[in-house]
A protein has these predicted regions:
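Charge-dense, intrinsically disordered terminal/linker segments
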Residues: 1-18, 27, 45, 78, ...
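Acidic, Mg2+-coordinating phosphoryl-transfer loop and its flanking beta/alpha structural elements
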Residues: 140-174
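Active-site neighborhood of HAD-like aspartate-dependent phosphohydrolases
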Residues: 11-65, 154, 164
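Short, acidic loop-to-helix structural element flanking the phosphoryl-transfer center
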Residues: 67-96, 103-108
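Short amphipathic alpha-helix with an adjacent loop that forms part of the alpha/beta core around
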Residues: 132-135, 171-177
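Substrate-recognition "cap/lid" segment bordering the active-site pocket of phosphatases
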Residues: 97-139, 146-150
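Short, structured coil segments at secondary-structure junctions
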Residues: 90, 119, 155-156
Length: 177
């Protein structure tokens, strides 16, 4: 005699195989262009400085131009390929996992930017080195920072180093998504 499926059985049959976390800056949002437009320096040039120098230039440029940190983050452009990637992962109900700055306005600006994503509200804020706290079996992180991906993988998750939307989408397809 065949067993009648319970609600739990039905849920197990339809629940998603993976949980997807997607970074914002450098994946969906063009932080590099925004930084260069703000500071007149490329992020690769600014990265050659120490971390404090990078962010001091950012903060000083905001003050000089009269731009709030909220406005900076809320108004960033899409990363090239960002909309394509978002449209691909959207059916899987992804979470945004992004690093805030020390200024609380960055959280509010990023939260408002995320509203472009069809009212999506699933957003987590973690410094890059703590993103792996959310890692685990069947949890995917799409991020453009190799060190973050390495920590994610070491914590048991599946990290996808984002270099372009087509490359990331291909890696997701290899996972059956």
């Amino acid at each position: 005699m065949k067993k009648t499926p319970t609600l739990l059985d039905l849920y197990e049959a339809i629940k998603p195989k993976y949980t997807i976390f997607c970074d914002m800056d450098g994946v969906l949002v063009d932080f590099d262009k925004g930084y260069e437009d703000l500071t007149s320096k490329s992020t690769s040039h600014a990265d050659s400085q120490d971390r404090d120098g990078f962010w001091n230039l950012f903060n000083n440029s905001l003050k000089e131009k009269g731009i709030s940190e909220y406005q900076y983050w809320a108004d960033l452009d899409w990363q090239p390929g960002g909309q394509e990637l978002w449209n691909y992962i959207k059916p899987y109900n992804p979470y945004i996992l992004t690093a805030p700055t020390y200024n609380p306005e960055s959280r509010e600006g990023k939260r408002d930017w995320v509203q472009r994503l069809d009212g999506m509200k699933n957003i987590y804020f973690r410094p890059a080195k703590f993103k792996s706290d959310l890692s685990g079996k069947n949890k995917i992180l799409i991020d453009d920072r190799e060190d973050t991906i390495n920590r994610w993988n070491a914590a048991g998750g599946i990290g996808i180093l984002h270099t372009s939307a087509p490359n990331t989408i291909e890696q997701l397809k290899q996972l059956g998504l």
